[in-house]
């Protein structure tokens, strides 16, 4: 494959994933295939978002790192000193992606570090590693293009997370606003009683203690359930099982109590 064909392969991957959840493993595999190297896609905090192994590295520490999908904190921080592509770093370089405790086995091993940048901020790092043979200009062009594509996908994922969080908060706010004063008071007492995201409660006991009717509690729970904020299930004499579905709800309730 020439450079153009390899670039088209990255484009095909991007087009195929349009509108789907981000698959960083697939991205790593594609880059690994066309560059012929091990590929590690790291987040800002060193989380291994995607990995593709083309050349096996027999080392227990590395295996554990891959299983836990987390690079060491110190190493991750050191990557932020690299602001542009650094190619063909040998085993003696602090940024090598090979186990330094086995230097003798990796005398010809080379690492290339490519910062992943998007929206004016550092989003992560693309690391390429080969047991031998240098990364040439074509490899670096593909790596930088790949890092740009990964950066776009990370930004898109972050944008979707922000939108989802905003939707969750809006749903909670609408659900709370739909409650009457006595229903809101009942809900506050219910979740004081639960002391967590889920649990059992006996509505009649809460009604007697707080001085409200049982129907107020039932109506309040029904409104929250219809909004998708909680789920509830009657367990007969045992009471009612309640589980919070929207993780923004308890925080919103706590903020109301503080006012």
UniProtKB/Swiss-Prot annotation:
Residues 1-155 are annotated as: GAF domain. Keywords: Cytoplasm, DNA-binding, Phosphoprotein, Repressor, Transcription, Transcription regulation. Residues 203-222 bind DNA. Its main location: cytoplasm. Signal peptide: none annotated. GO terms for cellular component: cytoplasm. DNA-binding global transcriptional regulator which is involved in the adaptive response to starvation and acts by directly or indirectly controlling the expression of numerous genes in response to nutrient availability. During rapid exponential growth, CodY is highly active and represses genes whose products allow adaptation to nutrient depletion. This is Global transcriptional regulator CodY.
